[in-house]
Amino acid sequence: MTLLDLSADDVLNTTRAVRKRLDFSRPVEDDVIRECVATAMQAPSGSNLMTMQFVVVKDAEKRQAIGEIYKQCWAIYSSMPMFAGAIKKEGESEQAQQDRVVDSATYLSEHMADAPALVLGCTAGRVDGAPAMMSASVMGNILPGMWSFMLAARARGLGT
């Protein structure tokens, strides 16, 4: 797949949550996923630990199972006080935008399994029972890599 003719600023300024515009019928070649993962692995890592790993799931049954877990997590999140749908904006247009965000995120929770591939960012080890700061540090360590994966996909014309 050819890279789009985009500057770094273009990629950063045009990478959005495109949940309702994802083309679930568009196949994604393994080589393209590998390129995006290779780019993502160049991301910074706390203490240079490099504990991030990526799991690519293309099997339909496994994608379905992951989609079900995502739906369950979405249901839990949607009952929390910090849920995007619980946030009330001041202006009418701002509230309409917030409602669209919630609508598109709900859509993704219902269609996660429809993606031709799921790429899961993981980190080595577990944080069960660890202090909050350690948990946040370990889990946050994968975020630069996941963002880099999203930017690499965007540079190749793919949504994430």
Predicted features along the sequence, with ranges:
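Covalent nucleotidyltransferase
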Residues: A40
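Glycine-rich phosphate/pyrophosphate-binding beta-alpha loops
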Residues: A43-L49
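Short secondary-structure junction motifs
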Residues: L49-M52, A155
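Short conserved catalytic/interaction loops centered on acidic-Pro-aromatic/His motifs
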Residues: P131, A153-T160
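Short amphipathic alpha-helical face segments that pack within enzyme cores
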Residues: N141-P144, S148-L151
